[in-house]
Amino acid sequence: MTEKFAVVDTETNWNDEVMSIGVVIADAKTQQKMDSRYYIITPEYRVGGMYSSELRLDGEGVHIAERKQALREIGQWLDTNHVRKLFAYNASFDRNHLPEYAGYQWYDIMRLAAYRQYNRAISDTADCYKTGRLRCGYGVEAVLKMLSKDNRYSETHNAVLDAGDELRIMQLLGHGISTYDIAVVTGKRTSGSIWE
């Protein structure tokens, strides 16, 4: 059986409530995308937010559901795919907004992407702390521009597209999944499915 992991991204509304969730499942060995899901959370998306225009309500594969249903369906899909590891850029943000998924093992992509030791695209002249972490300019957009050398790239702030971009960062960093053991956020998955 192919070992898999998922990359998760959330977008929030003006009330700091999750209004959309994007999840991309990838092969743990090749880090290639295998499948994805995109949920718009109702009624939260109706509140509006900074990136409401990027929700793409009529897009292909869009699921509009209440939070409980969306999280249950995503959780069942993750379980069906034997996914136990969730990756996110600034993972504590997404993990804190998805406490229902605290049982999964969370990893922060930024903990590698923002450090000279793990990101060979960070120049010798970049302003870094003694630890090797960039002092600024380590968001998804800046890091993906740096790694891809594509200055035209612009982060969309659409949860499923951003999850795909965060997977691309992992691919460009070129580290195996085990390297992210240093980037564990917290939490352990209990045995069995929490969706039964």
Which residues make up each language-model segment?
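Conserved non-catalytic scaffold segment of RNase H-like nuclease domains
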Residues: 2-100, 134, 140-146
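Short alpha-helix plus adjacent loop in nuclease-associated cores
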Residues: 109-134
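Short coil/loop linkers at secondary-structure junctions
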Residues: 58, 104, 150-151
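Acidic, Mg2+-coordinating catalytic module of metal-dependent nucleases/exonucleases
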Residues: 85-91, 97, 128-196
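Substrate-recognition/cap helix-loop segment adjacent to the acidic, metal-dependent catalytic center
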Residues: 92-114
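Active-site donor-binding loop signature of nucleotide-sugar glycosyltransferases
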Residues: 41-43, 109-111, 149
